[in-house]
Amino acid sequence: MANAREILDRMKSIQDTMKITNAMYMISSSKLKKAKASLDETEPYFYSMQMAIGRILRHVPDMKSEFFNQRPEIKPEDRKVGYIVVTADKGLAGSYNHNIFKDVEECLKSNSHAKLFVVGEMGRHYFEKKGLEIAHQFHYTAQNPSVSRARNITEKILEEYLNKELDEVVIIYTKMLNGVQTETETRHLLPLEKEHFKI
């Protein structure tokens, strides 16, 4: 049976753990609010751009661009698909990273010509441990996105697409539904499809 000293030590240990947990909760809440604010600022811009492209396509329906070229001459099994995978930089994120890894592995099963472009430390560690080749590593933290980082990623992907090193580009990331709910989103980026733009 534990003596009084051992019981006091355990109580102190539990109290210390509670303090650490509360501190982690406060930090997480602050980061979540910041991320939500960034999302609220960015989403209107994204949808405005989508609608603007839709209006252009309405007035120039026969516009030719390599970005709209579906490359029908390439068989589905021969298409080279680039997957941009966005993961977290740290663990302790519940199913956040796990769900992304699961979706990526499902995609890789159906495509033998896949290339991985990974953003985030957890993704890099996971795929390296699995022995999967990462085509190009973007050494950026996922939690601090910026326009210049997005531009660097875009330039690399577009270069490979225009050089026909890639036939399709897909992004896999976590979409925030509300303050507590998220889901893994798989979005087809290239080639563009006119019907996907709001007109």
Give the role of each language-model region:
Residues 2-199:
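Conserved loop-to-helix interface motifs that mediate assembly, gating, or partner/ligand docking
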